[in-house]
């Protein structure tokens, strides 16, 4: 079979493939540019290269060019330190990195995208497209140990796109506004869905509230991928009606009931999802109707995905295990990692979850974020949700700290522009939580650390001194 981009160029060539504020390419134009760059890339004589790229057209051309040249791409998070980049690339035997952004990194052969045309050209028309080949390599966050290299095959990506089409829905007339970084699976998956289906991606380099609102109001945007915090920023800034939006896909963090209530009040078509780097983006998806029935669900089990709970406790809570064609076959690095899959071939996600009587899947917390106090499990999300329900609190995060008596106890950081009576806040918790779950310390802070795409940096909350301003011990 031919590569998806070649098929779109032949059957859908005049349709816009990629649009930015500066430039646009049809599928035919994208294919010819990518094929030309692929002919130069073969001179590198590399099976696998690193990519240091951003959300722009050159980067999309480069991605497709690598695939046309049968080169695996290892994505580099541009926010990493040089030391982290070097360790990641060395772990998967990368010798050459191609970049569209300025980059200096010792120990590698570096080529800027614009300099590739100085290389010799070789024909790539004889290459055969193989679905079982590795398309991309991405790294997990490594917050629970060494960073893990995740190989994603073309078949993994295809299965993910098919699952998304079934649960979310898209077609060739779809226009998908994408601001999530394409070096992350959430961003790259939009590029892949587009080339598989033949729809248009409107690519945004960086999340800026005013620019995003302008694009939504000006262009016929039908789909959009966000994390919950960026949706909140958009609603606060004036996204109070759907305009042409048909689907807003949320992921990367848990939804609060307050956010869902606000979105539904504005008639925004929000879908919640669960996915990982290891599952090539979303694995489960909750429709607006599902969210109205159960706000905290990430969807239901279906015939295309297999889900089970490992060692459930008395409440039905246990580790979420999943199986499907979009799940990776195993890590490239470390190659032999214990407890990746169970004996039945289910991937062990590390998430604490429940499947209720209606088949709804509810994710409580990452196992690594779980607070264990005196042998009792405490889910930070539950505490954060109740905190945000207290009048005047705009944002909150709960983390565990060491305690000589209980092992760990929860503490709360919250954001407000009002004078909060902390005795009343504690009473609010007492009315909603068992005593062992009530935070033992409270810190009022100006803001919480989020990435540029709106994802809470929980690790920074644990490692940095946010204890500025008012605080109180209960």
UniProtKB/Swiss-Prot annotation:
Gene3D superfamilies listed in its UniProt record: 3.30.300.30, N-terminal domain of ligase-like
Pfam families: AMP-binding, AMP-binding_C
Enzyme nomenclature, EC number: 6.2.1.26
Record InterPro entries: AMP-bd_C (IPR025110), AMP-bd_C_sf (IPR045851), AMP-dep_synth/lig_dom (IPR000873), ANL_N_sf (IPR042099), MenE (IPR010192)
The reaction(s) this protein catalyses: 2-succinylbenzoate + ATP + CoA = 2-succinylbenzoyl-CoA + AMP + diphosphate
The keyword Transmembrane appears for this protein: no
GO biological process, one term: menaquinone biosynthetic process
GO MF annotations, alphabetized: ATP binding; medium-chain fatty acid-CoA ligase activity; o-succinylbenzoate-CoA ligase activity
Keywords, alphabetical: ATP-binding, Ligase, Menaquinone biosynthesis, Nucleotide-binding
Pathway the protein acts in: Quinol/quinone metabolism; 1,4-dihydroxy-2-naphthoate biosynthesis; 1,4-dihydroxy-2-naphthoate from chorismate: step 5/7; Quinol/quinone metabolism; menaquinone biosynthesis
NCBIfam families (alphabetical): menE
Primary role: Converts 2-succinylbenzoate (OSB) to 2-succinylbenzoyl-CoA (OSB-CoA).
Family affiliation: Belongs to the ATP-dependent AMP-binding enzyme family. MenE subfamily.
Protein's UniProt name: 2-succinylbenzoate--CoA ligase
Lineage: Bacteria, Bacillati, Bacillota, Bacilli, Bacillales
Gene, per the UniProt record: menE
